[in-house]
Each structure stands twice: as structure tokens, then as C-alpha cells.
């Protein structure tokens, strides 16, 4: 039986990447060492690190005036690092809240300043994104923060917001899933465990002119400039996670880049949403059509009892990790870059059969 893992994260990795890592596990390129054993300052790992950054820059066409940082601490650490580094003498910043992770981000940021909510989708139950014409930004804000894709609610921005201040985006769950104009952002960050690689690595892309103005008392490890000046080698980096991310970047390049993966993601999500919408109400997706996520697809059935049966039977059929987040319930299929089209086809076939038996 073929197994398909629909986990929201840590998520599945491309099979080609796993096989390559398996081949090189005990002997990387004839070095006699596993990447896990290498000195992070040795020439072998330095070449791995350099290629990973070069490939990422090529994939996203990152301008030269942006630094790429390979950090630790997960996206949670960025909820503090962003205000510590980007308030830059100001006392306030704006946050757009479209779900759980936006709420967590502003709660943490309020430890460091007067953070305002410029817009929120809470009134609609976080099932959509308020039109930007209704936002109330502060022109004196240090930055504007938003989450491009909310994994729990399945709400994804179909546009890059206009902003007169540095734009900060948490792209943890849709990084590299579609082309993005990096030059429109002051800072992008992403935890690795959804579209980049295994857990333990956090990527930051930051414009150089925003560096070097941290809040007084900022810990050294939370200073972007310290890491930028040391080329992400201020302390021992998560070497194996960087190596794995590099393999994922190579896999993306070999499979049409971000434009190619965007087309496949649209095809996968389109099939799944069509199945939901054409089920005569047996399955329901609560998210507004125009901002439905192509990464995380939440849906409900008529009763919680039926939802539990769906998840249990899917698990027995090799369709794993479909239970919705504990805060909202229901069912959620996470179909990140590495999910093959065959996995979504298997899921929709199961959905059709389940609806036939229980409809």
C-alpha cells in the first residue's frame, strides 16, 4: 500500500531528495564523512552552504542588496526577532491578522512595542482576508507584518499587500510554492519544516539597510546583523538541515523552478477543491473562494462523528495526518510542494467512496 502523508508540518519531503540523502548518508561525495559529522567551517560543508544559498537566490531571483540567513529557533523566534531588529527607533508597527499565526505573532511582538492591528479577519471567523481598501495602516509604523498562508484556517493571500513601510512576511507554509517579488519586502522568514526541509532550520531574507539598529538589550543571537556579518556561521548552524534544504532547492530547479511548482500546486489544489465543491454539501470548505490556500485545505463533514470516521478510515487506507488542527477540528489536507499529484488523486478517490457509503 502506498502511503501519503498530509501532515501540516513537519511535512513530507520529495522522494528524490530522500533517496539522494540516503545515498550520501555515510559518505558525502567521497569525503568519508556524513554531513552530520562535518565541521561547519570545513571546506566540505562551506561548499554545501554556499550552493544552498546560491540555488535559493536563483530560484527566487533575490536581489544583491538582500542577505540570506540560515538560522535556528523556528518561526516562533522571528516573532521576537522582527520587532527587536526592525522597530529601529520607533515604538509601533502594524499587523494584519488573518488567523492563528498572525495572532501569535502580534502577541509576542507586543512585548517590545505598541503593535497595532491594521486589519483582521476575525469578524468572519478568519475565513477570508479583508479588502486592502478597508485596512487602517499607520504611516508612521516601523513595518507591516502579515502571514501569507495560515496553515490552520487555510487562508492564503492571493496578492502582495501595498505598503508604504517595510513589509514583513511570515511565509513559513507557502515559501517557494509560487514566484514572489522579493524586492517588495523588507524581510521574509520561513520555518523549514513545510516546504524547505526538516525541522530545525529557519530561513530569513532581509534587506541590508534594515540591519544594525536593534533594540537596546537585544541578545547577540537575536541580532540579524551579527548573523549576516558571519554568513550565518556566528554559532554552529543546523548543518544537516541546511544540507537537506539545499537538496530541496536542487530538486526544485530540476523540476521547473518555482513557476513549475506553482502550476503543479494549482492543479493539485484545484482537483481537491473541485471534489469538495461538487459533493452536494457532503464536504464543505468554509474559506472564501478567492483566498483558499493551495497548501492547506480544510474541510468539514456533517458531524464530528463522521469526521472522526473519515480520518480513521483514511489512515487505514494509507492517507495519513488528515485530522484538522485541535483548535478548529474538522479535516485538513496539507498538500505542500512535495505532495505528488498521485497523492491528491488517491485522496479524492477515497473521498468519493466515503461519500458514497455515508452520504
From Swiss-Prot:
It is found in: Cytoplasm. Signal peptide: none annotated. GO terms for cellular component: cytoplasm. Pathway: Amino-acid biosynthesis; L-serine biosynthesis; L-serine from 3-phospho-D-glycerate: step 2/3; Cofactor biosynthesis; pyridoxine 5'-phosphate biosynthesis; pyridoxine 5'-phosphate from D-erythrose 4-phosphate: step 3/5. InterPro entries: Aminotrans_V_dom (IPR000192), Aminotrans_V_PyrdxlP_BS (IPR020578), Pser_aminoTfrase (IPR022278), PyrdxlP-dep_Trfase (IPR015424), PyrdxlP-dep_Trfase_major (IPR015421), PyrdxlP-dep_Trfase_small (IPR015422). The keyword NAD does not apply. It catalyses: O-phospho-L-serine + 2-oxoglutarate = 3-phosphooxypyruvate + L-glutamate; 4-(phosphooxy)-L-threonine + 2-oxoglutarate = (R)-3-hydroxy-2-oxo-4-phosphooxybutanoate + L-glutamate. Its cofactor is pyridoxal 5'-phosphate. L-glutamate binds at residue 41. It comes from the Bacteria. Pyridoxal 5'-phosphate binds at residues 101, 151, 170, 193, 235-236. Pfam families: Aminotran_5. Keywords: Amino-acid biosynthesis, Aminotransferase, Cytoplasm, Pyridoxal phosphate, Pyridoxine biosynthesis, Serine biosynthesis, Transferase. Catalyzes the reversible conversion of 3-phosphohydroxypyruvate to phosphoserine and of 3-hydroxy-2-oxo-4-phosphonooxybutanoate to phosphohydroxythreonine. NCBIfam families: PRK05355.1, serC_1. Belongs to the class-V pyridoxal-phosphate-dependent aminotransferase family. SerC subfamily. Homodimer. This is Phosphoserine aminotransferase.
Amino acid at each position: 500500500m502506498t502511503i501519503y502523508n498530509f501532515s501540516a508540518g513537519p511535512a513530507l519531503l520529495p522522494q528524490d531528495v530522500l533517496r539522494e540523502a540516503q545515498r550520501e548518508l555515510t559518505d558525502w561525495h567521497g569525503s568519508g564523512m556524513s554531513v552530520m559529522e562535518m565541521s561547519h567551517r570545513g571546506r566540505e560543508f562551506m561548499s554545501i552552504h554556499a550552493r544552498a544559498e546560491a540555488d535559493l537566490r536563483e530560484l527566487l531571483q533575490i536581489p544583491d542588496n538582500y542577505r540570506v540567513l540560515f538560522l535556528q529557533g523556528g518561526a516562533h523566534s522571528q516573532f521576537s526577532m522582527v520587532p527587536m531588529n526592525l522597530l529601529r527607533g520607533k515604538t509601533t508597527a502594524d499587523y494584519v491578522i488573518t488567523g492563528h499565526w498572525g495572532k501569535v505573532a502580534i502577541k509576542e511582538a507586543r512585548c517590545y512595542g505598541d503593535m497595532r492591528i491594521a486589519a483582521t479577519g476575525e469578524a468572519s471567523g478568519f475565513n477570508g482576508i479583508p479588502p486592502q481598501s478597508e485596512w487602517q495602516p499607520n504611516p508612521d509604523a516601523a513595518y507591516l507584518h502579515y502571514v501569507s498562508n495560515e496553515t490552520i484556517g487555510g487562508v492564503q493571500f492571493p496578492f502582495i499587500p501595498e505598503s508604504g513601510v517595510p513589509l514583513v512576511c511570515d511565509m513559513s507554509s507557502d515559501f517557494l510554492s509560487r514566484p514572489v517579488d522579493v524586492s517588495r519586502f523588507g524581510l521574509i522568514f520561513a520555518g523549514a519544516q513545510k516546504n524547505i526541509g526538516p525541522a530545525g532550520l529557519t530561513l530569513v531574507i532581509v534587506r541590508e539597510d534594515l540591519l544594525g539598529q536593534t533594540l537596546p538589550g537585544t541578545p547577540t543571537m537575536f541580532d540579524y546583523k551579527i548573523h549576516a556579518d558571519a554568513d550565518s556561521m556566528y554559532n554552529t548552524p543546523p548543518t544537516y538541515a541546511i544540507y537537506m534544504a539545499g537538496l530541496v532547492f536542487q530538486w526544485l530547479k530540476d523540476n521547473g523552478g518555482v513557476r513549475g511548482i506553482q502550476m503543479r500546486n494549482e492543479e493539485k489544489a484545484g482537483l481537491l477543491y473541485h471534489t469538495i465543491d461538487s459533493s452536494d454539501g457532503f464536504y464543505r470548505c468554509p474559506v472564501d473562494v478567492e483566498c483558499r490556500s493551495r497548501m492547506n485545505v480544510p474541510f468539514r463533514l456533517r458531524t464530528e462523528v463522521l469526521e472522526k470516521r473519515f480520518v480513521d478510515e483514511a489512515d487505514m487506507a494509507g492517507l495519513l495526518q488528515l485530522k484538522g488542527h485541535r483548535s478548529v477540528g474538522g479535516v485538513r489536507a496539507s498538500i505542500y510542494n512535495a505532495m505528488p499529484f498521485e497523492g491528491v488523486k488517491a485522496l479524492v478517490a477515497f473521498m468519493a467512496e466515503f461519500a458514497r457509503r455515508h452520504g
